[in-house]
Amino acid sequence: MPLSVLQRATLLSLMLVALATPVRAQDIFAVPFAGVKFGGSTSIFDLEFAADKKTFTMGASVVVLGNGVFGYEVDFGYMPNFFKNEESPPVYKPGSYVIDLSGGVLLALPAAVTGGGLRPYAVVGVGLVNAQAADVLEIFQIRRTVPAFKIGIGAQALLLTNNVGIRFDLRHVRSFTGDDGSLARVGRRISYSRFTVGLLLRL
């Protein structure tokens, strides 16, 4: 049976994580984070023209990274009120949101080079973006799940204790799908960037 787009995206995400070859002395980190979403764009029914507005974002990552170059992560982001524009008359009911979930591969500066300081890294991953919203009359109800990719850069270090540190992260999320003019595919494009600061916790 042919795989759906979402199934293929999920399998590709798992393959990216699996292809990140483990190295000796790897550490596992939990990273709860918070920050700001900015620079968004979408063809989904954005009735309040809010996609490009700044909004609060939060989430968490699980990162596996040793002293070498390669690592991998699972990343989850949550953006409440993604379709809410404070400068516009309310159209959507409270509670709209966008979430993203992805698996990714990290390329980090080796610990031997940074000497225990901030370790810069780059990350690329694939996964899914889900958008949910409904207008006050429930005429337009948004329920979209689309495959997407993430690219980003950041830096992290255990600066506070041997097991607690900080992570700075900037990444861009963009759907693979676009709008080709057919009715079935209209409203499936979404992109945004986010800057977050996270608490780095070695498990």
Predicted regions and their residues:
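Cleavable N-terminal export/targeting peptides
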Residues: 1-27
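Short glycine/proline- and aromatic-enriched beta-strand/turn motifs that initiate or cap beta-hairpins
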Residues: 23-66, 76, 126, 194-202
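Residues that define the transmembrane beta-barrel architecture of outer-membrane proteins
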Residues: 26, 52-58, 95-101, 118, ...
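Transmembrane beta-barrel strands of outer-membrane/channel proteins
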Residues: 32-40, 74-78, 122-128, 155, ...
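Extracellular loop and loop/strand-boundary signature of outer-membrane beta-barrel proteins
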Residues: 44-50, 86-94, 134-142, 181-187
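Gram-negative (and chloroplast) outer-membrane scaffold detector with strong preference
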Residues: 61-136, 146, 160, 196-201
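Predominantly the C-terminal beta-signal and adjacent terminal strand-loop region
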Residues: 81-85, 157-203
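A charged, solvent-exposed segment within the mature domains of Sec-exported extracytoplasmic proteins
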Residues: 131-177
